[in-house]
């Protein structure tokens, strides 16, 4: 197939999917702007792959995600014996997500984790647990090992007598020692874990949550079969510097279709007024930080957000 024909296929993909995945209008709080990306070097010669690689880059997907999508589009084409520009890849087998050994999976979470509060201190964890927030995470930043151990132990104690599930961000050994419900790691922290460390977390019986920011990271997370997967950042956030642009609602919905075998958590810049659109994608949990931490009355804010989760 000639380059012009491959270009025409790429144009067709962009035409059919630009409304959802292209540069989106940003006139309201539910829209993000996605900038076309350079096309990465091709790794295989098939026309479907080449067209999808071009198209997904033009639709704003970074190189690793454009590559992941192009490979999936090629597998979809081979599996169905047709190249369908209208069908965005969403079958797990086309992303290599099938055939995992259930015995190696981390312990299960409820399919819907509900409102998920990400909180900086054990005191705030306890307050939100007592306010009825069903899932809480201690994101305690410190380089002092003793302070970390003390804060994690205090957080575990703070949720006792409540129904809250407590995840500890990053500090996996302290979480194991204190008997937390689970740990949550970012993608870089997951990559930094040695095999023996990951085995120790698995052997402890703790649940594992993993942050992801696109297709390639979701595939990477699936390799360890975590208890849940977080998807974000959905909207712009000032809390931490992100390596990727905000994902937006259309991408979030596509991620949910692909990863529905996992409990899923949407995170990143989500305010109460955006809960209906987020819930409509099918995620079973919405994580918030500022909406609780910066609220003048955190308990009242929690009650409002819990009501929003119920629709």
Predicted regions and their residues:
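Active-site phosphate/pyrophosphate-handling residues
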Residues: 173, 250, 287
